[in-house]
Amino acid sequence: VRTLSVLAAACLLALPAWAGQPSSALVVVLDAGHGGKFPHDGAHGAHGLLEKNVVLAVAQKTKELLEAQGATVLLTRESDLDVSLADRARIANDAGADLFLSIHCNSMETREDRKVTRGVETYFLSPDPTDAEAKMLAELENGGPESIPLPKATNAVIGILADLALGQARNDSAALAEIIQHHVIRGTWAQSRGVRQAPFLVLSGTKMPSALVEIGFISHPDESRLLAKTAYQDKVATALSNAVRDFADRVLSRRLVAQAVKPAPALKGSEQPAAVNVATELPLAIDAVATEPQAAPAQVALPANAVARPDGTR
């Protein structure tokens, strides 16, 4: 009984997070970027399309898909409102969200760049931007070249714990960005501009894994037409909801272990089992499960009969 109790708890890690578990255990905050009037109304695209309207529609569709499966989903804005970056992060923190996803459309300034630049890219927080382009985008979204505010610790112990928590959240954020990029590209077949990092203020204020996805270039004539179509917005929303579920399998598995390890029912007399030392034995069981080979979601191959893209890839 003693051994089985530990192994049963550890085996939860091998199960999908939503398997046999109410999806209401998952709390997601979706952030539709920008909103309100100039200068916070976001990018203006071809054919009069506005970023703030596209991303709100996608966020609302993604919310519906996740709620249909029982998840709790909050939007940082539900209409054309100007919500500060600090308030967007506060909404996620106050909700105790498991993840935060900020949805945006990209844009280029020059006429030549607007004709040729298109595709999807996903960002996670880092004070060191991938390149000059990532740095400029962060400054644009931040409203200026502001630096990331670092949390202040009241003492050494709290500082260490805060660093550990932030470190884990940032590692998880990188994984979240990879999973989002994979699913959006797979679901829309848009051009992939990869996973990148930059100092986005809206991400710096969150205490949970977070990412920012640019679902396309609203400045590109063809991509703008796609982003305006309800059917394409549905594809993006489906891809984002699949990405959230994929990532939740990892996040909730840790929570399930913490919540599910409970004392075994008391037995009579000599049948009473020895107490399980969870602090020492559960980590060993978890390590054993963790060593089992598992496919990384971001590396899932497309079917062999998938239609090839124009560049020959599948």
Predicted segment positions?
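Catalytic-core regions of hydrolytic enzymes
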Residues: 20-150, 167-178, 234, 256-271, ...
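Bacterial N-terminal signal peptides
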Residues: 5-16
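The feature captures the short pre-catalytic strand/loop hairpin that immediately precedes
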Residues: 136-162, 215-224
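Active-site-adjacent mobile loop/cap segments within catalytic or ligand-binding domains
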Residues: 26-29, 40-43, 49, 109, ...
